[in-house]
Curated annotation (Swiss-Prot):
Region (Interaction with ACBD3): 2-68
Annotated GO biological process: inner ear development; phosphatidylinositol phosphate biosynthetic process; phosphatidylinositol-mediated signaling
Identification of the protein by name: Phosphatidylinositol 4-kinase beta
Pfam families assigned: PI3_PI4_kinase (PF00454), PI4KB-PIK1_PIK (PF21245)
InterPro entries: Kinase-like_dom_sf, PI3/4_kinase_cat_dom, PI3/4_kinase_cat_sf, PI3/4_kinase_CS, PI3K_accessory_dom, PI4KB-PIK1_PIK, PI_Kinase
Chain intervals for the UniProt region annotation (Activation loop): 687-711
């Protein structure tokens, strides 16, 4: 059994008839698992290997054969994966495994000792339990990741690698950092089990390819430079960037030899021009971007991409599909590095606006914003809306990005460029002038501009001869329809009976809304982001859309992103995953805690992008702009104590405060000054900046020794120590901790896997994981947990170190 070699390749379905997809035996499997759950955690590795070898027998038998998709069509297998977009999940175990108990009984010799017979029977039972667990509905992606990480048997690892194809893409994507970190830093068997799935998904999605390439580079940076160059992570990253993993139908396409309309070029000249432009896509713009010495390990990216584009140019194929996006990202990062050299916030803001104005000369292009959740093309960056955020040493900045949503990024043509002076604001179809743009005009819009030496072919953009303006669908009398709305038309969805609303209630609510309209912040040259962040998101979208030449298009969307240079966002990504997992746990357990995980894109070990929290400003900005206490600000924004708006905002504050207090305790989040705590328009608080978690603290000063930050101002908003909402806050803390410890393994494994091979400061010390587990207090009763929560709340509220750290931040950084 130990000599058997397991081939951890992707699933290659056989032509044998199958008994149905896994998990179809629902009831009986679940009952067996429930009865034997106490023994599942102690499974003999030898038994596990035998079980999974049997399950993977079909894979080994067909090594070198032609796989067949679930539709009956053959699949090409390149780099260990099929081209077809549909991969069939593992079938039920072969018949010999389902009948293993009978076979075991037949093979036991009559003269075998009773001890040996008992061992075989126990092994058979454990093997059956393991297989049934893997095939049951209880086996989710979290359990798959756990077995992949903890198992030492190639058979188990290969089986789990193939089972990844059965899970939803978004479920696996959540664990992508863990999968890639295991691929880089664990043994070959784990890597061989993971690679087929990664390769398959890279063929399907260009965004997945980008994320894999970025994460592989970032998580390989902790390795020694000589080891890194030859590591499996670097090789897979090169494979992705070389464009070998693009869909087969795209890879086989040749550039069209027919000239586009109005180009005035012969077919031969035009083909040569496109080929040159595409092949040099990754070189031209990056040639003038300043490199920083902060991360010399990744300076070979340009060389790798350059060599890959040369081979593509020689093979006369389509351009490297990731090259335009990588250039777009590098341009944004280069802007941040240049801003950091300027002394004042005002100079940084002016430079940012001018840099983004130049950037617009390259748009629209085949680029996208990776933090978005839908396919789109970037068409414009409203440069005057960008702001520099607060930072003492660096220059993170916030930009808004106009995009056009599309069904498929790869197959949809890049939108035509509409000049800024052609269309400003379109309120009706009649106001739309007939717009056309010639090829010469389009080329002019991508002409060489200052600070970008000879970069007019840096981003791959589809050649468009004539602009086609897509008109929105006309809805007649849409304004009149609003005025015709009446109370009589409001009906219950279930009973269809009229719903009567008291006129007094309507009048009272309207008067409350008019009396307590959210205040606007004054413009501060030292803090220009305050005004931009305070503006309601819907109002900002409306205003930018009216001033955009693309705003009349029905698929126009506005996105925002924070660009950070000089910061390692890998810890931020880890914190995002933990918050997302806790949010899911509390929803599953129906605990009304509120937290707001925001997306993180790790670009390298010292740069990245962050999804901004809209309709939110920091408590520091609130106190500085309003010169009010937190409670008085709530009263100003939401009305008096008895209004619906105030009571709703107060409840939101309590639920979010309790949620983030638990997060800060479990992850030991530090650097909790008022600049890192946001307050949104609905009363929630949102903690940001998780750069100091677990074993790390700012400058190792050790100021913050309390479990979490709970100031007297927070308690005042809750109604004081004797208020019902303060008791509600403590009850939520207890319920949230009880719910979290029920699912401790799901949280701990996220952190534990990322510690593998990592040099991040949050993992310094050998007791990081042990201390994390201890904070779940698995051995305590609920009564003991309640006492613990009382002690933590009391200690945090009276903590002198919290006050000292706030004072330190005020003296050194001016944070109130």
């Amino acid at each position: 059994m130990g000599d058997t070699v397991v081939e951890p390749a992707p699933l290659k379905p056989t032509s044998e008839p199958t008994s149905g997809p896994p998990g179809n035996n629902g009831g009986s499997l679940l009952s067996v698992i429930t009865e034997g759950v106490g023994e599942l955690s102690v499974i003999d590795p030898e038994v596990a290997q035998k079980a999974c070898q049997e399950v993977l027998e079909k894979v080994k038998l067909l090594r070198g054969g032609v796989a067949v998709s679930s539709r009956g069509t053959p699949l090409e297998l390149v780099n260990g994966d099929g081209v077809d977009s549909e991969i069939r999940c593992l079938d039920d175990p072969p018949a010999q495994i389902r009948e293993e108990e009978d076979e075991m009984g037949a093979t036991v010799a009559s003269g075998t000792a009773k001890g040996a017979r008992r061992r075989r029977q126990n092994n058979s039972a454990k093997q059956s339990w393991l297989l049934r667990l893997f095939e049951s509905k209880l086996f989710d992606i979290s359990m798959a990741i756990s077995y992949l990480y903890n198992s030492k048997e190639p058979g188990v690892q290969a089986y789990i690698g193939n089972r990844l194809f059965c899970f939803r893409n978004e479920d696996v994507d959540f664990y992508l950092p863990q999968l890639l970190n295991m691929y880089i830093h664990m043994d070959e068997d784990v890597g061989d089990a993971i690679k087929p799935y990664i390769v398959h998904r890279c063929r399907q999605s260009i965004n997945f390819s980008l994320q894999c390439a970025l994460l592989l580079g970032a998580y390989s940076s902790d390795m020694h430079i000589s080891t890194q160059r030859h590591s499996r992570g670097t090789k897979l990253r090169k494979l992705i960037l070389s464009d070998e993993l693009k869909p087969a139908h795209r890879k086989r396409e040749l550039p069209s030899l027919s000239p586009a309309p109005d180009t005035g070029l012969s077919p031969s000249k035009r083909t040569h021009q496109r080929s040159k432009s595409d092949a040099t896509a990754s070189i031209s713009l990056s040639s003038n971007l300043k490199r920083t010495a902060s991360n010399p390990k990744v300076e070979n990216e340009d060389e790798e991409l350059s060599s890959s584009t040369e081979s593509i140019d020689n093979s006369f194929s389509s351009p490297v599909r990731l090259a335009p996006e990588r250039e777009f990202i590098k341009s944004l990062m280069a802007i941040g590095k240049r801003l950091a050299t300027l002394p004042t916030k005002e100079q940084k803001t002016q430079r940012l606006i001018s840099e983004l104005s130049l950037l617009n000369h390259k748009l629209p292009a085949r680029v996208w914003l990776p933090t978005a959740g839908f396919d789109h093309h970037v068409v414009r960056v409203p440069h005057t809306q960008a702001v520099v955020l607060n930072s003492k040493d660096k220059a993170p900045y916030l930009i808004y990005v106009e995009v056009l949503e599309c069904e498929n990024f790869d197959t949809t043509s890049v939108p035509a460029r509409i000049p800024e002076n052609r269309i400003r604001s379109t309120r009706s179809v009649e106001n739309l002038p007939e717009c056309g743009i010639t090829h010469e005009q389009r080329a002019g819009s991508f002409s060489t501009v200052p600070n970008y030496d000879n970069d007019d072919e840096a981003w791959s953009v589809d050649d468009i001869g004539e602009l086609q303006v897509e008109l929105p669908e006309v809805h007649t009398n849409s304004c009149d329809n609003i005025s015709q709305f009446s109370v009589d038309s409001i009906t219950s969805q279930e009973s269809k009976e009229p719903v009567f609303i008291a006129a007094g209630d309507i009048r009272r609510r309207l008067s409350e809304q008019l009396a307590h309209t959210p205040t606007a912040f004054k413009r501060d040259p030292e803090d220009p982001s305050a005004v931009a962040l305070k503006e309601p998101w819907q109002e900002k979208v409306r205003r930018i859309r009216e001033g955009s030449p693309y705003g009349h298009l029905p698929n126009w969307r506005l996105l925002s992103v924070i660009v950070k240079c000089g910061d390692d966002l890998r810890q931020e990504l880890l914190a995002f995953q933990v918050l997302k997992q806790l949010q899911s746990i509390w929803e599953q357990e129906r605990v009304p805690l509120w937290i707001k995980p925001y997306k993180i894109l790790v670009i390298s070990a010292d740069s990245g992008m962050i999804e901004p929290v809209v309709n939110a400003v920091s408590i520091h900005q609130v106190k500085k702009q309003s010169q009010l206490s937190l409670l008085d600000y709530f009263l100003q924004e939401h009305g008096s104590y008895t209004t619906e708006a105030f009571l709703s905002a107060q409840r939101n504050f309590v639920q979010s405060c309790a949620g983030y207090c638990l997060v800060c305790y479990l992850l030991q989040v530090k650097d909790r000054h008022n600049g890192n705590i946001l307050l949104d328009a609905e009363g929630h608080i949102i903690h940001i900046d998780f750069g100091f978690i677990l074993s790390s603290s700012p400058r190792n000063l050790g100021f913050e020794t309390s479990a979490f930050k709970l100031t007297t101002e927070f308690v005042d908003v809750m109604g004081g120590l004797d208020g019902d909402m303060f008791n509600y806050y403590k009850m939520l803390m207890l319920q949230g901790l009880i719910a979290a410890r029920k699912h401790m393994d799901k949280v701990v494994q996220i952190v534990e896997i990322m510690q593998q091979g990592s040099q991040l400061p949050c993992f310094h010390g050998s007791s990081t994981i042990r201390n994390l587990k201890e904070r779940f207090h698995m051995s305590m009763t609920e009564e003991q947990l309640q006492l613990l929560v009382e002690q933590m709340v009391d200690g945090s509220m009276r903590s002198i170190t919290t006050k000292l750290y706030d004072g330190f931040q005020y003296l050194t950084n001016g944070i109130m």
